[in-house]
Amino acid sequence: MKIVILLSGGLDSTTVLYLARSLGHDCYALSFNYGQRHKQELAAAIAVAQLAGVIQHQVISFDLGLWGGSALTDYTLDLPQNRAFKEMAEQIPITYVPARNTIFLSFALSYAEAIGATQVYAGMNAIDYSGYPDCRPDYIAAMQEVYRLGTKQGREGEPIQIITPLIDLTKPAIIQLGNRLGVPWAKTWSCYSDGGGNDPPVACGVCDSCRLRLAAFAELSLTDPLPYR
């Protein structure tokens, strides 16, 4: 089956890529250079796409930093550090990028319909949707309706399907799945910083994304292979 995968280069989307590959799908990856401060994630996406042997990897460039509204695209805003996990779950964070997943899923829909793909795979999961409005199941259901109503394939009764295989999984469960699939964790990138200009890049260890990732590995008594400050 021909599918499109939204690939950020992070832990979740890389696991989804390796899962789709294990199912025998023909994988077409789509990544974005959208003005994010953590450019290292794009380098990670390119690396894991090559390792996984995707058929095609498209990188789309545009600048959401033109209007900001997020600490990931507005460099005048500070990234949250050392936040409590309870706080992460209860509030929409300043790292939320306005309508980002709507933009990403729209590009993925266009790409999928153009190449004749039947599904779009994305890495939303239980941890994400506790804090981000565009990672929640009701949002995915609404976008699925857009896919049905807004495309030729959808109107002909064969809408492209949005597949979110991690939607009910916690971060530790995702890591366990990734280990079974042989995901190269050392090639992935989750940090909201750019790696500090180091070679190899070094994750900050204190942003929300780093803390969730580190806690998940620790819960499984595993060592995250990424270097941290």
From Swiss-Prot:
Record's catalysed reaction(s): 7-carboxy-7-deazaguanine + NH4(+) + ATP = 7-cyano-7-deazaguanine + ADP + phosphate + H2O + H(+)
A GO term for molecular function: ATP binding
Pfam families, alphabetized: QueC (PF06508)
Keywords: ATP-binding, Ligase, Metal-binding, Nucleotide-binding, Queuosine biosynthesis, Zinc
Keyword Coiled coil applies: no
HAMAP family (alphabetical): QueC
Assigned protein family: Belongs to the QueC family.
Protein name (database record): 7-cyano-7-deazaguanine synthase
UniProt source species: Cyanothece sp. (strain PCC 7425 / ATCC 29141)
